[in-house]
Amino acid sequence: MKFIILALCVAAASALSGDQIGLVQSTYGKVKGDSVGILYAVFKADPTIQAAFPQFVGKDLDAIKGGAEFSTHAGRIVGFLGGVIDDLPNIGKHVDALVATHKPRGVTHAQFNNFRAAFIAYLKGHVDYTAAVEAAWGATFDAFFGAVFAKM
């Protein structure tokens, strides 16, 4: 059954149109330089995500936002997301990498969905978030997280 779900998710990623991929890549290009702002928005929206990182547990988000450790970590997360976006529609290796690092730590589907919601909220405040952009990002996250969830 998991194979069928995974096959459907890969097919969904492949079904992203060139226009959708272009919209996702262009809007991401406008925000990828603000990795600290993106991670801050994610941690602010769901403190359980911040608590999943030992170096940030129990620390005041506003106090750590300007630190080098936070900036480095934000760069890693946003860089990973950038790799997914750059390689669209080929998400397989990124799915495997994310599952390999997050499944052992017990990251939940809810936390992934909360990351998605926080990232989308951040995007809405920083790009021209049209209906077409919304559909493109929705299809991208549906395909990527669908494949991730099938393996977790």
From Swiss-Prot:
Residues of the Globin domain: 16-152
UniProtKB keywords: Heme, Iron, Metal-binding, Oxygen transport, Signal, Transport
Pfam families: Globin
Alphabetical list of Gene3D superfamilies matching this protein: Globins (1.10.490.10)
Residues holding heme b: 73, 102
GO CC annotation: extracellular region; hemoglobin complex
Signal peptide from the UniProt entry: 1-15
Keyword field contains Signal: yes
Family matches, as InterPro entries: Erythrocruorin, Globin, Globin-like_sf, Globin/Proto, Mb-like_M
Domain of life assignment: Eukaryota
CDD domains in the cross-refs: Mb-like
GO molecular function, one term: oxygen carrier activity
Family named by the database record: Belongs to the globin family.
PANTHER family assigned to the protein according to its UniProt record, in alphabetical order: GLOBIN-LIKE PROTEIN
Name of the molecule in the record: Globin CTT-E/E'
Organism annotation: Chironomus thummi thummi
Gene of this entry: CTT-E
